Design a protein with these regions (language model features):
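Core RecA-like ATPase module of SF1/SF2 helicases and allied nucleic-acid translocases
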Residues: 1-168
Length: 168
């Protein structure tokens, strides 16, 4: 556990390259910590109800990488580590936050993403329907995340099993 995202990123990169011999930013088996609450991917009737900041997800399968809206995304099949009875699910990850020195997208980046997604629905005449389409767009709702091997102290709102996190 470290005090800053910058330091966590340096340690994570070193662990991935020198111990796990992984060169890519994302690999099957990676455990990622969610950095922003997400209400889109799980139904309200699911065990957790939503994906919370601090939850850990494990990547079971990487379906594809997508570059869209000048950002990088990964479509993956994931499992929530803290909820073993919760079925695994398909989701989209926002890779911009994976190595970011900030916890999540900044205000300007978030606004830029919103505007670019809105362009996809510019042919919708009704402002309300356009707003609903934007808010239900899978890329707009991509999960912000950081690598869960090393984490900083202010990102954690719950206790993490470090044996699982470090050893995968």
């Amino acid at each position: 556990i470290v005090r800053s995202n910058k330091r966590a990123n340096l340690y994570n990169k070193s662990i991935r390259e020198r111990i796990l011999f992984l060169e890519s930013d994302l690999a099957v088996g990676d455990q990622l910590m969610v950095v922003k609450n997400n209400y889109f991917w799980l139904g309200a009737d699911s065990q957790p109800g939503f994906i919370a900041n601090g939850d850990v997800i494990r990547i079971n399968r990487i379906n594809k990488y997508v570059e869209r809206y000048d950002m990088k995304f990964a479509e993956v099949h994931a499992k929530m580590v803290d909820y073993p009875n919760q079925p695994s699910f398909d989701t989209v990850l926002l890779l911009e936050t994976l190595n970011s020195e900030t916890a999540n997208l900044g205000f300007e980046q978030s606004q830029l993403l919103y505007r670019k997604v809105a362009q996809d629905y510019s042919n919708e005449k009704s402002k309300y329907k356009r707003f609903i389409k934007i808010k239900t767009d899978p890329y707009f709702n991509a999960i912000g995340n950081s690598l869960g091997t090393i984490t900083n102290t202010y990102d954690n709102t719950n206790i993490i099993n470090l044996d699982v996190m470090v050893l995968y």
